[in-house]
A protein has these predicted regions:
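Conserved N-terminal phosphate-binding loop of PLP-dependent enzymes in the Aspartate aminotransferase
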Residues: 1-154
Length: 154
């Protein structure tokens, strides 16, 4: 009953929270004019891709990178790529870094953040490489391989 009443009524929200969106847009445009954001994103993303790719190569692994500098997607070039990604995520969490198969570069990222990430990856990748070579990846993952895709629980 109440939902039907709301459905048929006209409510203007011009002076409610909808002022937040345009205000944020104006602030974003001002920031984009004052800072070369695309250049920063390209630099940070390149440092991330190059650094992680080089570390992986030293361990005999290949990581492929895709996407725009602001949205880097990474995947291990291996038949059990999802399992390797899961192991990498678990071990990086133990180093205090939450990682997934994507890196979303932002203006807030600086060299020190990439340095910290690469320092942790340098500790973790030897085990990931060993697991890939010995084939015991699944034994090293405490709660199973990550789920891919999206599905409703109901």
């Amino acid at each position: 009953k109440f939902m039907e009443a709301a459905q048929s009524s006209f409510i203007s929200s011009s002076y409610w929270t909808e002022g937040v969106g345009p205000t944020a847009a104006v602030a974003t445009l001002a920031k984009l004019k004052s800072v070369n954001v695309p250049s920063h994103l390209a630099s940070i993303s390149d440092r991330f891709r190059t650094g992680l790719g080089d570390l992986a190569k030293t361990q005999g692994l290949t990581i492929r990178f895709y996407g725009h500098p602001a949205i880097t997607v990474l995947t291990f070039d291996h038949p059990q790529a999802s399992a390797l990604q899961t192991l990498f995520t678990v071990r990086m969490l133990e180093e205090g870094i939450l990682v997934s198969s994507g890196f979303y570069a932002s203006l807030s990222h600086h060299e020190k953040h990439i340095d910290r990430f690469l320092e942790a990856a340098d500790k973790v990748l030897p085990e990931v490489s060993q697991a890939a070579k010995t084939g015991d990846i699944l034994k090293r993952i405490p709660n199973g391989v990550k789920h891919t895709g999206f599905s409703r629980l109901t």
